[in-house]
Amino acid sequence: MKTLIAAYSGVLRGERRAEAARSENKNKGSALSREGSGRWGTGSSILSALQDIFSVTWLNRSKVEKHLQVISVLQWVLSFLVLGVACSVILMYTFCTDCWLIAALYFTWLAFDWNTPKKGGRRSQWVRNWAVWRYFRDYFPIQLVKTHNLLTTRNYIFGYHPHGIMGLGAFCNFSTEATEVSKKFPGIRPYLATLAGNFRMPVLREYLMSGGICPVNRDTIDYLLSKNGSGNAIVIVVGGAAESLSSMPGKNAVTLRNRKGFVKLALRHGADLVPTYSFGENEVYKQVIFEEGSWGRWVQKKFQKYIGFAPCIFHGRGLFSSDTWGLVPYSKPITTVVGEPITVPKLEHPTQKDIDLYHTMYMEALVKLFDNHKTKFGLPETEVLEVN
C-alpha cells in the first residue's frame, strides 16, 4: 500500500514539474513574442517614417518642378513682350555712363552683323537644348505629332495655324528641341519666321537667332529656299496678327482665304507645302474681343497696318495662383500635328491660276488634317474648322 501511495505521489510530483515547465516555457514564449513584436513594431514605424519622408520629398520635388515650369514660361513671355525694348533703353542709357564703350562696341558689331538674320541667322544647338525648354514644354504640356516622313532632298514651307496670342506651340516645337523635332524629322532644319522688326532690337535678335528664328520677309525666305541647300523647313504663321485678334478659348478659326503669298513663294522655289495645326493654341489665353467697327478694333487695325502687329488686351493666370489674372498662360495641352506634304512644282513665274490651285489644295488639306485629328484631342465630331 505504501508503495502504491509513494508511486502515485511521484506521478503527481512529475505532473506538477511538467506543468511548471510548460508554464515557464509559455511565459518565455510570451516574453519572446512581446520582444519580437516590439522589434517588428519598431521596424514598421521606421518603414512608415521613411515612406512619409519619401512622400514629402516627392511632393516637394513636384512643387519645385511646377514652379520651374511657371518660371520657364514666364521668362519667355517677358522676353517676347519687353526684352527688345528694355535692352534698347539700357544700351542707350549706357552711352551716358562710364560704360559707354560697351554700348559702342555692341552697336559697332550690330552694324557689321545687320544682315545675318536675312541669311538664316546663327542657330545654336546648345541654346535649343536648354533644360528650360523642357520645363516650358511640360508646363502645358506641348507635344509634336508627326504624320508623314519628310525628304531631306526637298525644301518645305510649313503653314502653322492658328496664331493664338503668342504662337507658343510654334516656338516650343520648332525653335527648341524640347519636343525632339530634329529626331522626328531627321535632316530637316526648321526656321520659325517672325516679324522682321524683332531683329532690329539689340540682344533680342541674338536670342531669337540662336533658336533658329528668322524674319518673315521675302529676302530671307528666298535665301533659305535657294541658297541654303535642301532640308530647310520655313515655318510661317500664316494668319499673323489678324488671326491673333480672334484668338479665344473654344474657337477654332484660321485666317487663310486671302493669304496666298506663302503659296507663291512655294511655287517659285518648288518647296512643298505642309499644313500644320496646333490643337489647344487658342486655349492658353483669354482676351477682350472688340467688335468690327468699334474704336478698339480700329486701333488694333491701325497698329497692324503701320507697325506689323496688333495689340491685344489679354490675360492668363497669376504667377503664384491660377485663381488670379496675370501674364502666365493657362496650363492647357497644346498638340501640334504636322500633316502630309503637298508636292509643289517649281515655277519661276507662277500665274494667278497656279497660285489659286495650290492654295485651294492647301486649304482642303488643312481642313482634312483638322477633321482627322480633332476627336483625339478633346473636340467633338461636330466641330468645324472656320476658314476666314
From Swiss-Prot:
GO biological process: cellular response to oleic acid; cholesterol homeostasis; diacylglycerol biosynthetic process; diacylglycerol metabolic process; fat pad development; fatty acid homeostasis; glycerol metabolic process; intracellular triglyceride homeostasis
Family: Belongs to the diacylglycerol acyltransferase family.
Residue spans, topological domain Cytoplasmic: 1-69, 113-388
TM segment ranges: 70-88, 93-112
Record topological domains on the Lumenal side: 89-92
CDD domains xrefs: LPLAT_MGAT-like (cd07987)
Pfam families in the cross-refs: DAGAT
Biological source species: Rattus norvegicus
Subcellular compartments: Endoplasmic reticulum membrane; Lipid droplet; Cytoplasm, Perinuclear region
Keyword Acyltransferase: yes
Catalytic activity: an acyl-CoA + a 1,2-diacyl-sn-glycerol = a triacyl-sn-glycerol + CoA; all-trans-retinol + an acyl-CoA = an all-trans-retinyl ester + CoA; 2-(9Z-octadecenoyl)-glycerol + (9Z)-octadecenoyl-CoA = 1,2-di-(9Z-octadecenoyl)-sn-glycerol + CoA; 1,2-di-(9Z-octadecenoyl)-sn-glycerol + (9Z)-octadecenoyl-CoA = 1,2,3-tri-(9Z-octadecenoyl)-glycerol + CoA
Bilayer topology: Multi-pass membrane protein
GO molecular function: 2-acylglycerol O-acyltransferase activity; diacylglycerol O-acyltransferase activity; protein homodimerization activity; retinol O-fatty-acyltransferase activity
Classification via InterPro entries: DAGAT (IPR007130)
Record-listed E.C. numbers: 2.3.1.20, 2.3.1.76
Gene label: Dgat2
Function of the protein: Essential acyltransferase that catalyzes the terminal and only committed step in triacylglycerol synthesis by using diacylglycerol and fatty acyl CoA as substrates. Required for synthesis and storage of intracellular triglycerides. Probably plays a central role in cytosolic lipid accumulation. In liver, is primarily responsible for incorporating endogenously synthesized fatty acids into triglycerides. Also functions as an acyl-CoA retinol acyltransferase (ARAT). Also able to use 1-monoalkylglycerol (1-MAkG) as an acyl acceptor for the synthesis of monoalkyl-monoacylglycerol (MAMAG).
Protein name: Diacylglycerol O-acyltransferase 2
Keyword terms of this UniProt record: Acyltransferase, Cytoplasm, Endoplasmic reticulum, Glycerol metabolism, Lipid biosynthesis, Lipid droplet, Lipid metabolism, Membrane, Transferase, Transmembrane, Transmembrane helix
Pathway(s) annotated for this protein in UniProt: Glycerolipid metabolism; triacylglycerol biosynthesis
Activity modulation: Inhibited by niacin.
GO cellular component, one term: cytosol
Subunit structure, as described in the record: Forms multimeric complexes consisting of several DGAT2 subunits. Interacts with SLC27A1 and this interaction is enhanced in the presence of ZFYVE1.
